[in-house]
Amino acid sequence: MASTVSAYKEKMKELSVLSLICSCFYSQPHPNTIYQYGDMEVKQLDKRASGQSFEVILKSPSDLSPESPVLSSPPKRKDASLEELQKRLEAAEERRKTQEAQVLKQLAERREHEREVLHKALEENNNFSRLAEEKLNYKMELSKEIREAHLAALRERLREKELHAAEVRRNKEQREEMSG
């Protein structure tokens, strides 16, 4: 479109110069003078003291058929023989089978990858669970040992207090016997 507009502007410049030159040679232009420039047709409508008026008609691209190649249907092939058709069908079937095998292979690879990922996730989960259980068991054993040691210390102190209390009672009884 831009090229058409620029071509139009160029033609209009050429037309004004041409009109000026023609007006020098011919004082009166022919009525309904038609000028053709490539893809444009120019008709002179009016000539006045204030200027001239023109009608510019742009041809459609379909009218330019001699200059541009005509788009036609592709050249027809000669009739293919039965053997050629059979070969083409076999080749198409082979391509289809190859493509189907490739798709199945990709699906199998994807499933295998999913299986591997799932197996790895389960293995990591089992390892985590086992480590967490071992850590918990260790903490429980440690807590149990600390508790038993604390209870043993309490029992030892209680036994010592009882021994001390028994000694104090014996001493008191001996004093009472001696004094009384």
Curated annotation (Swiss-Prot):
Description of post-translational modifications: N-terminal palmitoylation promotes specific anchoring to the cytosolic leaflet of Golgi membranes and subsequent vesicular trafficking along dendrites and axons. Neuronal Stathmins are substrates for palmitoyltransferases ZDHHC3, ZDHHC7 and ZDHHC15.
Subcellular location: Golgi apparatus; Cell projection, Growth cone; Cell projection, Axon; Cytoplasm, Cytosol
Chief site of localization: Golgi
Residues carrying Phosphoserine: S50, S60, S65, S68, S72, S73, S81
Record-linked InterPro entries: Stathmin_CS (IPR030514), Stathmin_fam (IPR000956), Stathmin_sf (IPR036002)
Lipidation (S-palmitoyl cysteine): C22, C24
Gene Ontology cellular-component terms listed: cytoplasm; cytosol; Golgi apparatus; growth cone
Domain of life, per lineage: Eukaryota
Gene Ontology MF terms: protein domain specific binding
Listed Gene3D superfamilies: 6.10.280.30
Keyword Phosphoprotein: yes
Protein family according to the UniProt entry: Belongs to the stathmin family.
Domain called SLD: residue spans: 38-180
PROSITE patterns attached to this UniProt entry: STATHMIN_1, STATHMIN_2, STATHMIN_3
Description of how the protein assembles with itself and partners: Interacts with STAT3. Interacts with CLU (secreted form); this interaction may act as an important modulator during neuronal differentiation.
Coiled coil ranges: 75-179
GO biological process assignments: blastocyst hatching; cytoplasmic microtubule organization; negative regulation of neuron projection development; negative regulation of Rac protein signal transduction; regulation of cytoskeleton organization; regulation of microtubule polymerization or depolymerization
Listed name of the protein: Stathmin-3
Record keywords, A-Z: Cell projection, Coiled coil, Cytoplasm, Golgi apparatus, Lipoprotein, Palmitate, Phosphoprotein
